[in-house]
């Protein structure tokens, strides 16, 4: 028994020794920083811009719709803390042509200075049964949600490396941590951001550039309202188990995590559990974070199995109900 205890203590000390070189990054000062937000004309992106503006940042809003950009600019400007702050609007499709994205980022840097933080929030959502989703929609999801983040990141990264500082944020989704019924087109495009972020963080860490992946739950945004119009019943019932968050709350947490240089940004108990369960080989920025993942993994996996059982039960019930309705229609 004593040998087991001794072995445990030795292993624990060795673990602390291996993790000890990990030092939390120095927080980014938003006051006077240049923050670029793609998808900044509405929803989470607009709220992130507002949150950064409250802390004195200069903002570049990037989106396709010029009218929405103008409206968003007016809303963001209400949160100014000094008369020097500026909100710049740029209309471009970040998923269409890299050369255009590179050009507008260059314009933004010429007007407001080098980009200190890039928030990749441009995205779209689509739900539906796999065989009912048009093939072109699978391509569209990857173009908008994945390449729409690759292009702006590629456009700012060289300058960030030269300055040896910066923050890159990817706004994923809890559907980018777990594949759910109805998200066969959407989930893969969000899962892809995690792989990009992990590889990019390993490349950028020596340059004092930190990457954050945010996994917000269902959030009350125009995009979410549009998605609900075509969402399968199974997807609605599963999603309802976690509720709907407000974009202002999401923005506050995301900005805080990005400023601190945290790799993962999660929301609420379910989000924390999902992030711990899916941590894999993702980087940590503190000893505490790593130890929490180690200690909670077994418990969270047990809880997750109950969740999965509940989700499978929902899918089976919906299938049975549909079959019963079809049978009743035939009898009539």
From Swiss-Prot:
Q: Which GO terms describe its cellular component?
A: endoplasmic reticulum membrane
Q: Please tell me which top-level EC class this enzyme sits in.
A: oxidoreductase
Q: What happens when the gene is disrupted?
A: Morpholino-mediated knockdown leads to increased 3-oxosphinganine levels, reduced thrombocyte levels and results in curved tails. Morpholino-mediated knockdown does not alter the level of dihydroceramides, ceramides, sphingomyelins and glycosphingolipids that are downstream of the enzyme.
Q: Which reaction does it catalyse?
A: sphinganine + NADP(+) = 3-oxosphinganine + NADPH + H(+)
Q: Indicate which residues form the motif GXSXG.
A: 39-43
For biological process, the GO terms are:
3-keto-sphinganine metabolic process; intracellular sphingolipid homeostasis; platelet formation; sphingolipid biosynthetic process; sphingolipid mediated signaling pathway; sphingomyelin biosynthetic process
Its name, as the record gives it, is 3-dehydrosphinganine reductase
Q: Which organism is it from?
A: Danio rerio (Zebrafish)
